[in-house]
Amino acid sequence: VESDVNSRNINGQRTSKYKILTPEEIASLKLDIEALEADLSIFRFNEGFQTGYSDKSGLIYIRGDVLSDLSSTHPRDLMSQRAVLAHEYYGHKYFDDLFGDKNPLPGAWNDEFRASYNAALNAPNLTETDRMYLMADALERAKEAGVNIKITTNIRRVLYGF
């Protein structure tokens, strides 16, 4: 079981991390992983503490909290399971592969910001809504840390379509 310190995660008030994913849910997640053109071999289902990329093992652990909470209004809760997988794979895993131990601490606002930002811009086969929620999540991460982010052309395009 991964500790909070060693696991990068999406957080939020999604479905409970204690929910055991069913074989049908896992099959659906595997289709999303395939659509994202991600390496299925690094994903572990119903293992780990919660959904998140582990810098220590180089694996992405998937728990029940990968599933949306449609009763919420927060982008982190509303984003699809595919968007969550993109956050972990095209965000945390990508930057861990690129920078290794030179990354911000797991869970730091800038680590979470860039994971959602990079996934919103670069993950293949996401819907416009997925990209919008990922970008909105990136901005929420900065806001929660008290950091102002300039709205760039990329941010505006993803959020507003222009």
Residue ranges of model-derived segments:
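Catalytic toxin/effector domains delivered as secreted proteins or via bacterial secretion systems
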Residues: 1-162
